[in-house]
Amino acid sequence: MDQLTIERQAPVIAQYDAVVCGGGPAGWVAAVSAARNGCRTALIEKMSYLGGTPTAGLVDPISGGYHKGKRVLGGVGWEFVERLVAAGAGQVELPKGHVSFDPEYYKLLAQRMVLEAGVELYTNTVVSACQMADGRVTHVLIESKDGLQALAAGTVIDATGDGLVCRRAGVPMQVSAGGMQPMSLCFLLRNVDVTTALLRDHIHHTGLHGQSKHMGIYHALQKLAEQGEDVPQFGGPWFNSTMQEDLICVNITRAAANAADRAQLTQAECRMREDAYKLVALLRKLYPEFAKASIAEIAAQGGVRETYHIRGLYTLSGADILGGAPCADGVAFCSHPVDIHSAQDNTQTAQYFDTPCPVPYRVMVAAGFDNLIAAG
């Protein structure tokens, strides 16, 4: 392969105490927290809006805010939920504490909270590289319509979802021994009758506490496949509220790919876009509730479950998660079960734990890098 050597200059346009790369849930919340604690903070996001997986990926609901009826979600995240609910754009369904939300209002509220905190927001901007010196990230290089620029950084938070900044900095990465979990491409479906027994216990905005994953539809699709019908690979399916009566969010497509690989990601998203229409056509044939259904919107990006993991100062083990032992540097609690989706078929496993799992700060700090933290 031919190689090009390119020399470019990047003006240093600003200096920040904290530069957060990625405006998904982990990123924008980290930026708000940093700014509220007195840091001059920049938030870099490739899309024109914030939210990441919940908005660009249409992954709904926000899962696991409660554990056995007790709230474990706190801080900026819970403040966000309270403001969603107050605006009529979200609903907390007990006892699990799943939060149904309006994806468009999510974008607006995240933006409001970021700007209210004094964060300097860089949308439509990508992180291209970082500059290192003595084991520290000194500058983050960004590209936008303004060209290549640099931000001087005291601390860098990598909330890109696939460790992009960490990989650029040379942090050792690892992948799961069993391979990466598959991704999904969610979509919004209009003209679905959610008032009958088929769906009403699976849609969060009804206020009922039914399981979101629809085993009845799962088995019906499996049966069609066994009969020789052309059924694309699927997961779930899950049907969730958007807080709008005429739109539901559907999580059903599935593709095994490394989402940190451009070619694999392109192929997977193209295939899942085709699969979404095939699966909706099958649902129209199977159930009168879907007879008039049509796709209103397909997510702008795939819902990625897994890519790379950093090697931090500490690695959270299965025993840590299932044991729920307290730790001195815990910064958050996880109450969602450990669910592993198979890349080979449409199955998944889930492990539930007795007590919420504390997430230690040590797992997010890149080993050997003083000022680089991975979140999300």
Task: Give residue spans per PLM region.
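Conserved acidic residues
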Residues: 17, 138, 154
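Flavin (FAD/FMN)-binding glycine-rich loop and adjacent Rossmann-like elements that form
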Residues: 5, 9, 53, 143, ...
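Glycine-rich Rossmann-fold phosphate-binding loop(s) that bind the pyrophosphate
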Residues: 22-25
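Extreme N-terminal leader/targeting segments of oxidoreductases
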Residues: 1-18
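Short, hydrophobic/aromatic-rich segments at coil-to-beta transitions
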Residues: 134-140
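Conserved N-terminal/central alpha/beta ligand/cofactor-binding core
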Residues: 7, 15, 33, 39-40, ...
